[in-house]
Amino acid sequence: MLQSMGDGEISISPYDTAWVALVEDDGGGRRQPQFPSSLEWISSNQLADGSWGDAGTFSIFDRILNTLACVVALRSWNIHPHKTEKGIWFMKKNMCRIDEENLEHMPIGFEVALPSLIDIAKKLGIDIPTQTRGLQEIYARREIKLKKIPRDIMHQAPTTLLHSLEGMAGLKWEKLLKLQSEDGSFLFSPASTAFALQQTRDHNCLKYLTNHIHKFNGGVPNVYPVDLFEHLWAVDRLQRLGLSRYFEPEIEECIAYVHRQWTEKGICWARNSQVEDIDDTAMGFRLLRLHGYEVSADVFRHFKSDGGEFFCFKGQSTQAVTGMYNLYRASQLMFPGENILVDAARFSANFLQLKRANNDLFDKWIITKDLPGEVGYALDVPWYASLPRVETRFYLDQYGGDDDVWIGKTLYRMPYVNNNKYLELAKLDYNNCQALHQQEWQNIQKWYRSCSLGEFGMTERSLLQTYYVAAASVFEPEKSQERLAWAKTAILMETITSHFEFQQLSRDQKRAFITEFEHDSILKYTNGGRYKRRSSLVGTLVRTLNHLSLDILLAHGRDIHQPLKNAWCKWLNSWEEGGDAELLVRTLNLMISGGGRRRRWASEELLSSNPKHEQLLKATIGVCDKLRLFQRRKVQGGNGCMNATGITTVEIESEMRELVKLVVTRSSSEDLDSEIKQNFLTIARSFYYAAYCNQGTINFHIAKVLFEKVL
């Protein structure tokens, strides 16, 4: 599916097809349609109730606009009178329902398009009821929109009105043709371009429409192409569904394609656009930055008004929830000093929080299964604290698959973005991973009991939470060794800390513990003698490192026992000073299996000599130690939760931004492998999660992520 991406897979718009069908052939002789196949499409796609529109979702805005346009097209050519009358009957019966519709779901340009169609219908003798309160409000909105962008500006510079020219009077076409897109369209709108062809007979308009009529067998979408939109949103959906690892080559190509079309002013839904929007720009910025491309945050200055507000399009009449949602998500990838993203985060968060407080999380661009849930998760669990399996588990409940429908000039579908195949695969993959995690959890409990870790102060609740954090962060089945190494390392660190602190060991006793470990061997064979099992905590530690090292030796032929032991020796000798994050990240990087396209192991010596590695290590240790301190104070104080703005301390936020920059930027051809870099951020985000979320939230996440099967 992803390999066949081109200009975009999208459903047909009866409204736009009707405008194309209205175009006359100027070849001389008798009056005839330029595109007879469009009339055939209209004739073949009337719904049973007499309307035209999206069959899966009933929106009166969508049905009225599509039906009126198709009726006008059929009456204009005096064909299919029965279908025409059936469509008129539908409108007479349902026009009053416009009063009841949610205005947030009004199609793009509806307030301009519907009045224009009504005027044409009246000239054709089509009797349409117009004296309804809802329709009068539509006319009022039309005047507001047209006044927002004065006619002189409209003819001088590209604006969103180029997308909705159809039916507008008093246009200066000699000026508008200079604003035509490279593909011959007017802002990629078939309806707007068809109207321009009617008025100008422009060859480029004709070429654009002819190409798409042929491609879509007589019909046309409400907008085309949608290449950037499709590339970006398909990747976003796959990532959030937890499926991206299956499509790495395709995703890399998608992101590279977007990067080739990127401009300093941003992008819109299609390449080579003269108009940019904040929604596509924010999604593009976020995904490009996540994949290591250099993109400047200054791009968002083009979407900020003098009053400090951010907008999607200049001259917009309403603000889209999803536009601000994606701006908020993009802002969380800020680097140090990017004040424009600080402003964007503040503005978008305030907008979304107000919408949520007013129970008003409806969007003008999409009707989706659970937009309030998506926005709520983003506000409640910021990106730094969002563990991959937690996000995916919630998104599996929020993603509507085939049922999600987009709002353009009409309702439309994007099958490469929203489809049940993604959803079915994601559910199957999640449940398979969860089953493996549950089996691992059973084995962790057996290990815990066999090692008598409870006697040293490790509780079963802490055991579960520690394994959960590892499994929610490194969830892939092929990363079982890394996941278990993380979990057992964290469990043993907590057990030893508890043993040292709560058993009130003397300094000499602690030193004896460390000395015993340092002088023992990971693999101890003396004169052919076997390693002697011991019940002590030191023995448990030695045996665990033995097993971890042996697993890697047998599976990949690498001997990691000495660097693993060295990492533990360092932690034991400085455990009071922190350093948990360093031990975890060193363990993860030693355990990298080397499988897959990107998974390349590097020796401890090679890593230690890499300046970027040392920068990452220093940054990770610094921020994780602060987060751990914050978490302990929160537990001890009982009310040390994050404040309402989601900020811990200025220092922590600043250091997280620096770490993100170190991880996602590519410094040179000698840069570290991406997975090694990601491990630093993965560990830091797990610490942030523990510090950010209260215990009740964590317990809820554990139950949902580890034990609640996706149905």
UniProtKB/Swiss-Prot annotation:
Q: What pathway, per the record?
A: Secondary metabolite biosynthesis; terpenoid biosynthesis
Is the keyword Isomerase in the record? Answer: yes
Q: Output one GO BP term.
A: miltiradiene biosynthetic process
**Where in this protein would one find the motif DXDD motif, according to its record?**
277-280
Q: Please list the residues that bind Mg(2+).
A: D277, D279
What the entry says about domains is: The Asp-Xaa-Asp-Asp (DXDD) motif is important for the catalytic activity, presumably through binding to Mg(2+).
What family classification does the UniProt entry report for this protein? Belongs to the terpene synthase family. Tpsc subfamily.
This chain's protein is named Ent-copalyl diphosphate synthase 1
Lineage from the top down? Eukaryota, Viridiplantae, Streptophyta, Embryophyta, Tracheophyta
Q: Which gene encodes it?
A: CPS1
